[in-house]
Amino acid sequence: LYSKDGQSYFIVDGHTHFWDGSPANQLNRYGEGFVKCFYDYHTNLSPYEYRWTLEEFERFPEERMIYDLFESGYDDVAVLQSTYLTDWFVNGFNTTAQNGDIAARHPGRFIVNGRWDPRDGEAGLDKLERLQERWQLKGVMLYTAEWKGDSKGWKLSDPWAYRYLEKCRELGIVNIHVHKGPTVYPMNRDAFDVADVDDAATAFPGLRFIVEHVGLPRLEDFCWIATQEPNVYGGLAMAMPFLHSRPRYFAQIMGELVYWLGADRLLFGSDYAIWQPKWLVEKFVDFQIPVDMQGEYGVLTPAMKRKILGLNAARLYDLKVPGELDVA
């Protein structure tokens, strides 16, 4: 728990990674460029004292992650999002098996999310079933702009994507996290377009679509979709660090999200190791919409922040919350 000014917050970090971006694992220049693009986000949007060297960033030890999330940081539970990118990384960037191994060594700390790619066809459906059997998945992380051979992306509205979403429904994998945010080199911007979420959310009302990075830079598109689709949620990873570098921009983002979605469908995420939960949580709890913007956006109350920082994600993943905080 994080406590400040008599208020306590249960923290569920909805977006973390334990990756291997080391040169030895980079398959080609695209893998190298992908890591360096992540690193640019890290250095440009982090407070100086939290910046790492590129070498530290490419591959960090398990012990450092545990310290940053749970000892120095305030995470009570963290969601490990699997990102394969096997066209660019020899052993994948961070796979379900790699994430599952670290979760097994730290019981109660992590939720492991799987991954699928509709371009894998029938074989991929079988693999998803095996992943579910092994890790009891409640969620997956999807990268619609991931490259595969000559293909540079896919859509949630594709016929094969529907097959996989139907399989998720059948297996009880109800939390569908989708990267719909800033482009990452060398991926294509349009392959991250949020528009296909509208189609899938309508077709699969029993699934929850967590739009990671809230569609940035297409925030308005995301908000107009989410306001009419009650099973669409906003993952705040990537939006959160603007607390430090662009606080008024962050106020605008939060104001729009709360106006259109309310506080019940927004999920905190650090996107570790790009950013660290310690300073994000501290700054978010201290943050308030500037006075001159409150006439349009209102204020963020401690109750709203509690939902965003952990209670909403706890509800999606059936996590036990300390009794005094269980108001969801």
Which residues does each PLM region occupy?
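Active-site gating/metal-coordination segments in enzymes
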Residues: 77-191, 323
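Divalent metal-dependent hydrolysis catalytic cores, especially in the metallo-beta-lactamase
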Residues: 36-58, 67-88, 109-115, 138-139
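Short active-site segment of divalent metal-dependent hydrolases/proteases
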Residues: 18-19, 182, 216, 274
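Alpha-helical scaffolding within the catalytic cores
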Residues: 60-67, 95-100, 124-128, 194-197, ...
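Histidine-centered divalent metal-coordination motifs
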Residues: 15-21, 179, 213
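Mid-to-C-terminal alpha-helical segments outside catalytic/metal-binding sites
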Residues: 1-14, 21-69, 126-130, 260-265, ...
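Catalytic pocket-lining loop regions of alpha/beta-barrel enzymes
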Residues: 27-28, 138-139, 151-268, 296-300, ...
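Conserved, mostly hydrophobic/aromatic
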Residues: 15, 103, 112, 131, ...
